[in-house]
Amino acid sequence: TRAEVFDVANAVLDGTDAVMLSAETAVGRYPVETVRAMARVIVGAEQHPTLERAQHQSTPLFGEIDQAVALSAMYAANQLSGIKAVICLTETGKTPRWMSRMQSSLPIFALAEQVGTSAITALYKGVIPVYFAASTMKPSMINHLAVESVRKIAHLEPGDLVIMTKGDFVNVHGGTNTLKIIRIGDMIQ
């Protein structure tokens, strides 16, 4: 119905991560067509100009360091010209969740080793999970390999900018404390 179309569109504009059909709608005679129509509404709403820039309420105090890094990364991503993607190394999925709450047209790549973390981040708006086994890598190579794992997916070209967030140590929950702005093609450390 028209009301359901507006409900779906408004949910997207309000920053909802996922939508689902009600039992009443899902049991109709045309379930596949209903899902296709809902997908078209979602894509249309996501292309609305108000979603291209961050529109968040400023929190007076951050509760945690990783929250401050996540929100700072998204602010920089939306304000610095040339940023093509955000790369977020994550153990639990908490950092990309905070990032997804800030509306942006930029993709957020959540690099995680745990399948459960990737499954959770797949539900966040604008977040693309990528398997990344950081615990098997030399610490000096993690930044370079993280960018390389996203480069083809994001269609990154030399000169493009990406923002990366990560922690100093692998396998530490809530340890995101670093934000880097990286130019593709430059030596990454």
Regions found by a protein language model. Give the residues of each.
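Conserved, mostly hydrophobic/aromatic
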Residues: 11, 99, 162
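Flexible, glycine/charged-enriched surface loops at secondary-structure junctions
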Residues: 22-23, 28, 47-58, 83-84, ...
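Nucleotide-binding motor/catalytic cores of P-loop/tubulin-like NTPases across gene-expression machines
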Residues: 95-97, 103-140
